[in-house]
Amino acid sequence: RLKPESFAINIEAFGELAPLESTRLAAQVSGEVVEWNPKFVAGGIVKRGETLFSIEKDAYTAAPLQAESALANAQAALIEEKALANVAEREAATLPNSRVTDLYLRKPQILSAEAAVKAAQAQMKIAKRDLDNTEVVAPYDALIVSRSIGKGDFLTVGTTAATLYNVEVGEVTFPLARFDQAFLPEALDGIDATVSLLNGTTDEIKRSATIVRDSGIYDSATRMTHLVARINDPYGLTTQQPVLRFGAYTKVSFTGKTIDNVYRIPQELITRRQLWILDDADKLVAKPVEVVREVGSEFLIRVDIAADDRIVMTLPEYPQNGMAVKVIEGAEKLVAKQP
């Protein structure tokens, strides 16, 4: 006898782990490479803000000093103009209004001096930025994929120095078959998932992940949509979790919809989308079933049966609807044979 139940659908799919972002790191100032980090090699891992290489900075050390001097001169000129304007304003009080102009009150001169101060401040920021940019740092915790420079190389602005992968976050983009799409939750963002990698032994590496989005389109060839699962710190730098490397082929599993009033039944009991039961007269009755989903060796089905209906576990060779059968007493399973 079977009882209907609620069943949470587990969805599994496969995809490749990739970085959330990659960067072609380029020089922002020109100059000679004078030093580089020993970890700045293909396969090296560096922390956010860690210096990767240094550009000769003599020319850039002087620029902030020159900009500071120019700023001081501009500020002094502004102070002088304001003082002259105050004198002019006092003198204007003794003059007819027709003779008091903006030029007499030195308003244009003050505007010009204020603009000069702002320009000097901007030049100071640029000079300091250029000096800072002689130390090229990692924009995030990164895996060095490739490096194309060495000590003594002269770089121009925009020269690509390396390719980096962000190891703070990884993503698995995986296709979802059409038969799974019907069991997706209403809202996908934030669903907990598990990303696992079979490492070739009996051990399975598993990491927690989150479904963050879908691709928004269907693949024109397969008619599949794609979802994206995100893993924080896939290389385990801060969490000390098992390492999942970029390029690894992984399995993503998560819980989909919960379906109600379904029966779990071994697949071998369903023939031609029918389930066989016995009526009160020990006659075979075929009940049409709706197969909702296949789960391992079982089907989840919907079928119109009563709680006390007897399910036939073993059928005669050629069962017919209404066929009278003999029930074997004491069998562990309900076996029906032709009399």
Q: How would you label these PLM feature ranges?
A:
Residues 9-12, 69, 73-77, 81, ...:
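Extended amphipathic alpha-helical segments
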Residues 240-286, 290-339:
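Edge-of-domain interaction segments
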Residues 10, 169, 176-227, 271-274:
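Beta-strand/loop subdomains of soluble extracytoplasmic proteins
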Residues 204-260, 267:
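Structural microfeature recognizing short secondary-structure transition sites
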Residues 1-18, 118, 182-205, 331-339:
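Acidic, gly/proline-rich low-complexity N-terminal segments at the extreme N terminus
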Residues 9-35, 122-139, 164-166, 213-216, ...:
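Short beta-strand-turn/beta-hairpin segments enriched in glycine/proline and small hydrophobics
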Residues 16, 45-48, 130, 137-182, ...:
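Surface-exposed patches in structured soluble domains
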Residues 3-70, 139, 145-150, 173, ...:
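Long, amphipathic coiled-coil "stalk"/hairpin helices in large membrane-associated assemblies
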